[in-house]
Amino acid sequence: RSVKLLSEEENVKNKIWQQTRLHEYLNEMPVSQILIEGIEADDIIAQICNEMYVGDYEKVIVSSDKDFIQRCDNSTVLYRPIQKKVLNKNTVIDEYKISPNWFALARAITGDKSDNLAGVGGVGLKTIARRFPFFSDPHRASCFYQLYEHCRENIDGPKVYKTVLENKDLVESNYKLMQLYAPSMSPQNKSII
């Protein structure tokens, strides 16, 4: 029967059945699974990248979610299957003119439609790359102070600087939700990983 013809209740049951089957299949393969109730997969993946035991092993994140771009570094790459692209720290800078260590802040400014997070109106990644050139510096850690200071210094310039300053609360709220550098997770949940 076509999934399109299922009732809402049947659709939910079908999804549960699919997830159960996938879990069973993966149990038969050399694949590790980590499921923690109440914790999103992206936070678990980010925490694994932070763990000492994975050290400098090359890590490959497979996802089309732009949130993972911020995790690209010398030992972590992102494979985006829908786009058929592999991103690393250098390709992110080449493509977006924004370093992965600034990417969460850039996306906090632009918002994320897929996560239903509004951004600062009229500001996209290209505008950020053009108006905030220090976002491309892989040796500079991102911080709100540098962003706001740059905006104050250029307040009489293009409108973007004033608009970002007027939306500081939105940017900071978005950042807390979007950043995967230090995922919020209890020590008990971290110990599971």
Predicted features by range, described:
Residues 1:
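Non-catalytic, usually N-terminal nucleic-acid engagement modules in DNA/RNA processing proteins
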Residues 5-190:
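Extended two-metal-dependent nuclease catalytic cores across DNA- and RNA-processing enzymes
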